[in-house]
Design a protein with these regions (language model features):
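Acidic, surface-exposed loops and disordered segments
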Residues: 1-238
Length: 238
């Protein structure tokens, strides 16, 4: 249906209202796309202003348009803007890290585990710092984001993580184009994996596995410049 230039092909699975003509004259230039990519960054200085719903809808639509393995299209999206629920996400993450820190500092566990997991122990001071900042009323997890986008899949999806992170990048670039800051919630995902349960998913009414999480907010300022990344490591095999 999509490839036919004259519209002569029809299919019951793809009704006319679901197919759209591409106006290639409206495509951004390669330079514009590259500028969008290079200007995107995790701006953690956020205001208390909510992200307008129409912007959130565009961000979700961009995520939904990402490719999926075997064209499964099995991604689902949950947008959280309820301040109480956002607080619960932070509380949950801090709680998991606090329990982990206490376990790692148990004398018996420390004696057995530390020689083999030195990299893990370097995070104990980080966990404790996050806990103290959280107790002081700061928001070291969500950075005062006013919205969360959770991307989730059925647990049976073998490529759920890959699909979700492809969708995340689409959403991230759309958010950047809208002037909305976006931050990858690595701490929250780490807590989910560490706990190994569905606690947060159940709290948020999500049926499935949370694969990627984006915090969203209106930035307090925009960066006027970007800095080049490290030198590209590349190799062409010809």
């Amino acid at each position: 249906v999509d490839v036919c230039p004259t519209g002569s092909v029809s299919h019951s699975e793809f009704p006319p209202e679901k197919t759209h003509t591409i106006d290639y004259s409206q495509m951004p230039t390669p330079e514009q796309v590259m500028l969008l990519i290079k200007s995107r960054r995790s701006n953690r200085t956020l205001t208390s202003r909510p992200v307008p719903k129409e912007m959130l809808d565009k961000i979700v639509e961009a995520a939904h348009s990402a490719p999926t393995a075997t064209n499964s299209q099995s991604l689902s999206f949950t947008v959280v803007t309820d301040p109480q629920k956002l607080r619960q996400v932070s509380d949950y993450t801090i709680g998991v890290f606090d329990s982990l820190a206490k376990l790692l500092l148990n004398p018996v566990v420390k004696c057995v585990v530390k020689p083999f997991m030195k990299d893990v122990y370097k995070y104990v001071p980080v966990f404790n710092r996050l806990k103290e900042e959280h107790k002081a009323g700061k928001d070291p997890i969500l950075r005062k984001a006013t919205a969360l986008l959770l991307i989730h899949t059925p647990k049976s999806n073998r490529f759920g993580s890959e699909d979700a992170n492809l969708a995340y990048q689409n959403a991230s670039l759309m958010a950047q184009s809208l002037g909305v800051s976006q931050i990858y919630m690595g701490f929250v995902l780490t807590a989910i994996r560490q706990e190994g349960k569905d606690t947060l998913a159940k709290t948020l009414g999500i049926d499935g596995k949370i694969q990627a999480i984006m915090a969203l907010g209106i930035p307090a300022f925009k960066y006027p410049k970007y800095t080049d990344r490290k030198e590209i490591v590349k190799n062409y095999i010809e």
